[in-house]
């Protein structure tokens, strides 16, 4: 079955909030996702479906020609299948259409799988945010993909 990647809509919000809670210790709320859809000039989200099942999501917070990559979440049983790569490539393509040239993100320093994915997509580590994450406390790598 092929992965369908498309813009997040109202119909995706509950499944997105559930996926967020499954993947993160401090997840976005359903209301936060609702609020982001009301600000399409700032937030850009994409979701990935296999059949009727939401299996991944990712977003951008856009500011002029830069964007923060946020909320990259893939259901555990669907990781390492290229879904996140396809999702992020589509998200950055859509961001570029809106004038975004440079992308940044924070990732847990111990999340080696995600770091390898971001490096494969052209991101480079440019710094550390000490004790950035809570539950558990962990440093964040600051990564950039610059045009």
Regions inferred by a protein language model and the residue ranges of each:
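Terminal substrate-recognition subdomain of acyl/acetyltransferases
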Residues: 139-147
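Conserved acetyl-CoA-binding loop-helix of GNAT-fold acetyltransferases
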Residues: 80-93, 116-120
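Conserved catalytic-core motifs of GNAT/GCN5-like acyltransferases
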Residues: 106, 124-140
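Acetyl-CoA-dependent GNAT
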Residues: 7-77, 88-90, 94, 98, ...
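Residue-level recognition of the GNAT/N-acetyltransferase active site
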Residues: 9, 75, 79, 106-110, ...
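Conserved hydrophobic beta-strand within the GNAT/NAT acetyltransferase core sheet
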Residues: 69, 102-107
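Short glycine/proline-centered loop/turn elements that form peptide/ligand docking sites
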Residues: 88, 111-114, 131-136
């Amino acid at each position: 079955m092929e992965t369908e990647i498309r813009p997040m809509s109202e119909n995706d919000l509950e499944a997105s909030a559930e996926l967020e809670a499954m993947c993160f210790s401090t997840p976005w709320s359903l209301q936060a996702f609702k609020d982001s859809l009301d600000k399409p000039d700032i937030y850009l989200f994409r979701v990935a479906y296999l059949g009727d099942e939401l299996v991944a999501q990712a977003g951008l917070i856009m500011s002029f020609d830069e964007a923060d990559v946020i909320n990259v979440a893939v259901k555990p049983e669907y990781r390492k299948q290229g879904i996140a790569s396809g999702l992020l490539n589509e998200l950055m393509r859509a961001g570029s259409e809106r004038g975004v040239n440079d992308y940044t993100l924070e990732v847990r320093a111990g999340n080696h799988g995600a770091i390898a994915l971001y490096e494969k997509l052209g991101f480079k580590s440019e710094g550390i945010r000490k004790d950035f994450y809570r539950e558990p406390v962990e440093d964040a790598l600051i990564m950039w993909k610059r045009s």
